Structure formats: structure tokens, C-alpha cells
Amino acid sequence: MASKTLRVLFLGPKGTYSHQAALQQFQSTSDVEYLPAASIPQCFNQLENDTSIDYSVVPLENSTNGQVVFSYDLLRDRMIKKALSLPAPADTNRITPDIEVIAEQYVPITHCLISPIQLPNGIASLGNFEEVIIHSHPQVWGQVECYLRSMAEKFPQVTFIRLDCSSTSESVNQCIRSSTADCDNILHLAIASETAAQLHKAYIIEHSINDKLGNTTRFLVLKRRENAGDNEVEDTGLLRVNLLTFTTRQDDPGSLVDVLNILKIHSLNMCSINSRPFHLDEHDRNWRYLFFIEYYTEKNTPKNKEKFYEDISDKSKQWCLWGTFPRNERYYHK
């Protein structure tokens, strides 16, 4: 019997770093269809509502710029929505969402300065134009700020303009389209990956323009919780990452410390903590926060998970375990 084709969503278009993360995750799977999504919300929504989709790959954080807040907020919103759907009073304060995290991927971010046309003198050719319009994803600007500042100082006679795009790969496509419509004294460039330049048959002016070496983006691999098939996760180590979100009883002094202290009591090492504001509805008070923590457990080490969960339930207002998954070996790469 022929094996089922896996259908995997990623933040498109093709040639993005999200595409690379999806390829890394399923590189050992022979029959995979990679489907570009137009936005991070689509990566969530389509996975939840289209049963033909098996997995979705979304960016979570960058080692230079920090959180990808769209992804954090989409996780937050799903927990809150699920909590509001529970009957009152609910039997438990543990929330079980419709999707779960089953793996992580890390993709080195190596940006290139890309041109739709061949420039005979390379970067020096920029001085021949009155205006240079640079296209890229908003997340990129903070990763190449020093490079762009240096370029502007090198060509003070040139006006540099930045234009946001939905993805790095789309920025190459957009600069190609724009260059055919503008006059000769305007040059359109893009900042994207070498893969994106090759995909769109564009020219790389300069490689590795990142301000910091080792810049990396972390991605989560999601699936529907009722999808009980093979997770397609390559398990190479003993260390597990657990992603848990919770809210506190805001007016109780020390309520956040009480939750975090449970990790110490159970000898669990927390490796990450973040927070996002939330509202239950338009009448809800401001300045309430949902917390994201990640902590380690080991594959073959017995832990009293149920007692840990009981303690979390006792000290938090509501909580959700999004998944337990292997620590990817790329996490340790510099």
C-alpha cells in the first residue's frame, strides 16, 4: 500500500527561512508536500480546520530580535478562547487546546543584499543611483541595522528607503517587479537568503550582511491534538523541552513566584520565560499577563508528572501544556 503524503504548511512563499525549517524537519520523510501559507495566522487556522493538513511550521523567536509576537499571541488567544468555552464552574483549570507542539527547528539566518539586475561594479554601483529602495521583512531591519547605516554613510548622495514585505522571499519577488516599473535612476534591492535569490534568479551583491554572526530563528512544529499518527520527529537525545502557559491570580502577592517555585520544588530547570498581555473580553481589566515558560525533563528519568501538574493547577489560575518535545541538537550550534 502506498504511503500517505504528508502535507506541511509553512510561512511562505517558497524560499523563506520557514520553508527551510520545514525542509529540515521532514528531510528524512520521502513523500512530503510543502504548502506555503500567506501569514502566521493561516498556519494556525488551516491546521486546525483542514484535516488534510498534517503539520504546520511557525517561527517563534529570533536570537537577535527576540519574540515573534504573532506566534506567541496566537498561542495565547487559543488558550483564552478554549478557557472561555469551558462550562462554569469548570471541573479543572487545565486547558487542552486543539493543537500541540511536537518539535522545534533552528535555522541560521544569513542575509544577503540582492539585486534584480547584475551590477557591474558590485556594491560600488549604488553610487550611480539617486534612490535605492530596499525591500525586506520587518524582522530583518534590526538584524542588519549597522550594515545599512554603514552603507548610507558610504553613499551620502543616495537616498535610501526601506519597504516592508510579508516575507524575505517575497521581498526579492517584489523588488524584481518594482524594478521593471521604475526609472533608471532608482534601484530596487532586497535583503533575503541565498536560497531566495536563487529561487527568483536574482543577483547577490554581498553575502552575510548580518550585524551579528550566529543569528538564528527558532521554529515550532505543530499538529492537531487528535491527530495520533507518527510525529515524524527525529529523536536523537534524552532532553525534553516542555512548553507551558499559565495565568496567575493577579491580586495575590507572590502569585508568579508561587508558580515558578514549583519548578524548583520538583528539581526542574526552567530554560525560558516570556509574557504577553491578554483580555478575556472588552470589559476585562488592563495589565493582565499570560506567562510562557519552558522547562527541561529527561526522556528516561521518572518524574512525578501528575503531582507537578496538581501543584501547577493549585497555584495558577489557568494553565496549558502545549507539548513535550526533544531538544533539537541545532540549539547548541553557534
Curated annotation (Swiss-Prot):
Its catalytic activity?
A: prephenate + H(+) = 3-phenylpyruvate + CO2 + H2O
Instruction: Tell me if Amino-acid biosynthesis is a UniProt keyword of this record.
Output: yes
Q: What is its main location?
A: cytoplasm
Keyword annotations of the record: Amino-acid biosynthesis, Aromatic amino acid biosynthesis, Cytoplasm, Lyase, Phenylalanine biosynthesis
Q: Locate the Prephenate dehydratase domain: which residues?
A: 7-224
Q: What induces it?
A: By L-phenylalanine.
The answer on whether this UniProt entry bears the keyword Amino-acid biosynthesis reads: yes
CDD domains in alphabetical order = ACT_CM-PDT, PBP2_PDT_like
Q: Where in the cell is it found?
A: Cytoplasm
Describe the function of this protein: Catayzes the decarboxylation/dehydration of prephenate to phenylpyruvate.
- Name by which UniProt lists this protein: Probable prephenate dehydratase
What is the scientific name of the source organism?
Answer: Saccharomyces cerevisiae (strain ATCC 204508 / S288c) (Baker's yeast)
